[in-house]
Amino acid sequence: MNAHVTPDSVTADSDETWTVAGRTFRSRLIVGTGKYKDYATNAAAARAAGAEIVTVAVRRVNLTDPSQPLLVDYVKPTEFTYLPNTAGCFTGEDAVRTLRLAREAGGWDLVKLEVLSDPKTLFPDMEETLRSLKLLVADGFQVMVYCSDDPVYARKLEEAGAVAIMPLGAPIGSGLGIQNRVNLRIIIENAKVPVLVDAGVGTASDAAIGMELGCDAILMNTAIAEAKDPIRMAKAMKHAVIAGREAYLAGRMQKRLYADPSSPLAGLI
């Protein structure tokens, strides 16, 4: 189901799954493969989260060198859908080259594009992102795009062929939670492709808020990997995403300035 669909129009079947680039998934939690103490912990956390998709930094994770521990031996491609990403790329050329190498290595064409502006904030460079997106789409890739929370750029990315829009909630690895709910709501309401919060989630309540706003899914890495107990946090995130989605579909009560008694006042003794 696309995020812009309202709760009233949801069917039981569409509620249970979401689809990106023609691929359907049940889990709405995507997890990363960085910052864990080892691949075994990473794999255990991904399973505890109930994740079906794991995102992989092609430039930082060992996928092909058999002399070193291989991610694929722990987080198995037969168990998870790999989503190669361009973490660490600061130019469109680097991003395009990285994803072409990923496709050659593993045959992956569903990818996550991120082109960063500077090492301090890791904000996306939106001009470079849009330029490289067009090149990748022309080259046959299905591209999910990390972007700013700017509704105008989100629309431009979708028009350029992005299969999913992934606005940041806060800077990557900051754990600050969703800082601009208004813009995120606007992006969700206008999008005809899935919208996922990408970056900034710090704890379970942040994930729940993103889902309550109507996101199709949440992507996170540091919130789980740097928790004191990554496996327990992965479980918490799984339940938070489910709870947030259920709350969105249920439709929250209206906020009121004054009290409204839970029990009727008529007929008091």
From Swiss-Prot:
Signal peptide: none annotated. It is an enzyme of class 2 (transferase). The keyword Zinc does not apply. GO terms for molecular function: thiazole synthase activity. Its EC number is 2.8.1.10. Pfam families: ThiG. It catalyses: [ThiS sulfur-carrier protein]-C-terminal-Gly-aminoethanethioate + 2-iminoacetate + 1-deoxy-D-xylulose 5-phosphate = [ThiS sulfur-carrier protein]-C-terminal Gly-Gly + 2-[(2R,5Z)-2-carboxy-4-methylthiazol-5(2H)-ylidene]ethyl phosphate + 2 H2O + H(+). Its main location: cytoplasm. It is found in: Cytoplasm. Gene3D superfamilies: Aldolase class I. Keywords: Cytoplasm, Schiff base, Thiamine biosynthesis, Transferase. One of its GO terms (cellular component) is cytoplasm. Pathway: Cofactor biosynthesis; thiamine diphosphate biosynthesis. HAMAP family: ThiG. Homotetramer. Forms heterodimers with either ThiH or ThiS. Belongs to the ThiG family. This is Thiazole synthase. The lineage of its organism: Bacteria, Pseudomonadati, Pseudomonadota, Alphaproteobacteria, Caulobacterales.
